[in-house]
């Protein structure tokens, strides 16, 4: 009688489930989405619930001290829950080995130019290594061939046209965290835009550190105008540009805004200040001769342009005279949207060592004064839209009340206001991700209200006009 022995089969070890915690800007978000896509393609389970995962990848921010503290609080909180951590992004690039030494639960750090290696990093962590994958000088930029799984609303996507920055503003640490500018070819960007259009994206937001400098490193001169015209062939209704440096808004770029139908006339201009002395101290001296002339040209060429800016108060050496100059500038230019920040000294930047620091209480008072000045201006700018019918991209819908929330072209996601929409006279409602015509009936400092314009309303309005 012959006996046989069955050898036990070895089952492959299950891959750990991974969750992501995203902190910081939308450029960081795109990096997170690439890491999610890479891990999903490699067979890892990716969860939106940190409780459900054994490993959490935290894509961190290190732009200012408040952001660093938020990143560290997130890391410590997850560590205390017993999670294994992979620290990615700007905090990892900034502090590198110090993070591994400070947080035993951190199994790896991944720099801003190294996120494309996330699968290899995780495999090495699974094998018991502690991994430092941080390039001294970030040089990578993702493209349309790198897997990506979006984490934003299905109707909205961010598209990174370049990475890094060649400017050296005195207050900014980004070049040390992200490296010098490296642009993607126009063909690569357009190819990814087509991919996103096929996914149903209705609004595409172009981002980089200085989007108006797009192409300078690659082509020898900026090519934003050519890029916008190429993207005009993509079937996405709204294309919005963020982070436009004022000196890069040339006549050809403004003409592209005017001529390309799906480019939204929304200009995000981080001006930071108006006074030549402060701009010189910020290492932005050329901007002083540009601000007012540029804004006048924009309004002449694009009468419906929506203008957003960011300003810094309390920069070292800012006097009361400088502040009054900025206050007058804000009052006369009448921006639609303004973000105002107090100066934050960042180690490793030129401004950190500047003398004549402004007292924090004085800086805060200046910020409060500018906010008080801007709020009625913002309300007045919104009020101009009352009575008009505009296209609104619906993002939320309450089936119980019928109320919808969306945005018209004058509002960018997250940083600006919303449009609160009621059903039309015929009860018409709209699903998230769709555009509907909305008649604006009310406005406040930040938001608009209105109702869907159905066929009956349009016919009635046409009869009145006739």
UniProtKB/Swiss-Prot annotation:
Cofactor mode of binding and number, as noted: Binds 2 [4Fe-4S] clusters. One cluster is coordinated with 3 cysteines and an exchangeable S-adenosyl-L-methionine.
Binding-site residues, [4Fe-4S] cluster 2: 165, 169, 172
Name this polypeptide is given: Ribosomal protein uS12 methylthiotransferase RimO
Pfam family, one: TRAM_2
Biological role stated in the UniProt entry: Catalyzes the methylthiolation of an aspartic acid residue of ribosomal protein uS12.
GO BP annotations listed: tRNA modification
Similarity field: Belongs to the methylthiotransferase family. RimO subfamily.
GO cellular component: cytosol
Keyword terms: 4Fe-4S, Cytoplasm, Iron, Iron-sulfur, Metal-binding, S-adenosyl-L-methionine, Transferase
Native source organism of the sequence: Synechococcus sp. (strain CC9902)
Reaction equations catalysed: L-aspartate(89)-[ribosomal protein uS12]-hydrogen + (sulfur carrier)-SH + AH2 + 2 S-adenosyl-L-methionine = 3-methylsulfanyl-L-aspartate(89)-[ribosomal protein uS12]-hydrogen + (sulfur carrier)-H + 5'-deoxyadenosine + L-methionine + A + S-adenosyl-L-homocysteine + 2 H(+)
Binding site for [4Fe-4S] cluster 1: 25, 61, 90
Keyword Metal-binding on entry: yes
Domain (TRAM) ranges: 383-454
Cofactor(s) the protein needs: [4Fe-4S] cluster
Source taxon at top rank: Bacteria
Limits of the Radical SAM core domain: 151-380
Molecular function terms from GO: 4 iron, 4 sulfur cluster binding; aspartic acid methylthiotransferase activity; metal ion binding; protein methylthiotransferase activity
EC number: 2.8.4.4
Span of domain MTTase N-terminal: 16-127
The keyword rRNA processing appears for this protein: no
UniProt-annotated location(s): Cytoplasm
